[in-house]
Swiss-Prot record:
Changing D117A: Reduces activity to 3%. Causes the formation of a constitutive dimer in solution. It comes from Danio rerio. This is Alpha-tubulin N-acetyltransferase 1. The keyword Phosphoprotein does not apply. One of its GO terms (cellular component) is microtubule. Residues 266-278, 286-297 have a biased composition (Polar residues).
């Protein structure tokens, strides 16, 4: 893939390693900022890779590389395109936290180095460029192909791994990553945890929801003296105990004050509640009335 500017000035090495800084070397004094051109190269490579893999959207871009701790290995041929160079392909790797299953069903939580995207220009495939790029990454990361995980590898990529690195027996996973049998050989038994079998889902009874509602209602306690209709009456709250009746010894129960039900007074129509003051006033008015009546006789 060629571009309308000198790629040798952007990427001085045959294989350049880019990280979130998007810089493959030192910025030359007096030259314009190479970041816009590097961004264009990465974005166009990501689009070409997604088109070759028939993906709905690119998984490699300059913005995504800046936002993650990934490494992009970019391979060029500096003699092509009139000495300005062409991009042959790229390989993107990064560490991912994964939950994997081995051949026995044991569960492993690990964070391996993963191949996230791999692309070689269609016209330059089957010339050994892919092997050169992949071998450079393995040496740079000091890792074996079987120790890595592969994110949604295409059939062509799986054929490349089998032919070049003898990776044949993949272990089925519940996610989009592919690992091979050798991946679990370097993991200790402490890292492996047997996954408990899932409980069979039983049929939900039609009255189970009603029963749960009844239990939930029974757990609610209304404040005294509001008593639930149809239910057993709740005891009235305890009166605060006097200092003499409160127990201070460890292990003894506090004494309860005796309950004194208040007597209800029923008033007939026309009656008013009586009190000593009212009775005294009524007696005085009656005595005065009697004396006034005697004076007229």
């Amino acid at each position: 893939m060629d571009f309308p500017y000198d790629l040798n000035a952007l990427f001085p090495e045959r294989i350049s390693v880019l990280d979130s800084n998007l810089s493959a070397g030192r910025k030359a004094h007096g030259r314009p900022d190479p970041l816009p051109q590097v961004t264009t190269v990465i974005d166009e490579l990501g689009k070409a890779s997604s088109k070759a893999q028939q993906l709905p959207a690119p998984i490699t871009s300059a913005a995504k590389l800046q936002a993650n701790r990934h490494h992009l290995y970019l391979l060029k041929d500096g003699e092509q395109n009139g000495g300005r160079g062409v991009i042959v392909g790229f390989l993107k790797v990064g560490y991912k936290k994964l939950f994997l299953l081995d051949q026995r069903g044991a569960h492993l939580e690990t964070e391996p180095l993963c191949v996230l995207d791999f692309y070689v220009t269609e016209t330059l495939q089957r010339h050994g460029y892919g092997s050169e790029l992949f071998d450079f990454m393995l040496k740079h990361k000091q890792v074996e192909p079987a120790q890595m995980a592969y994110d949604r590898p295409s059939p062509k990529f799986l054929s490349f791994l089998e032919k070049r690195y003898d990776l044949r027996n993949s272990v089925p996973q519940v996610n989009n990553f592919v690992v091979f049998a050798g991946f679990f050989q370097s993991r200790s038994a402490v890292q492996l945890r047997k996954v408990p079998p899932r409980k069979p889902e039983g049929e939900i009874k039609p009255y189970s929801l009603m029963e749960r509602e009844v239990v939930r209602e029974e757990q609610r306690v209304l404040p005294w003296p509001f008593v639930r209709p149809g239910g057993p009456p709740h005891s009235p709250p305890l009166l605060p105990s006097s200092p003499q009746s409160r127990s201070l010894s460890v292990g003894s129960s506090p004494s309860r004050a005796p309950l004194r039900p208040a007597a209800a007074t029923v008033l007939q129509q026309g009656q008013t509640p009586s009190s000593p003051l009212n009775d005294s006033c009524r007696a005085k008015r009656t005595s005065s009335l009697n004396r006034s009546r005697l004076s007229f006789h």
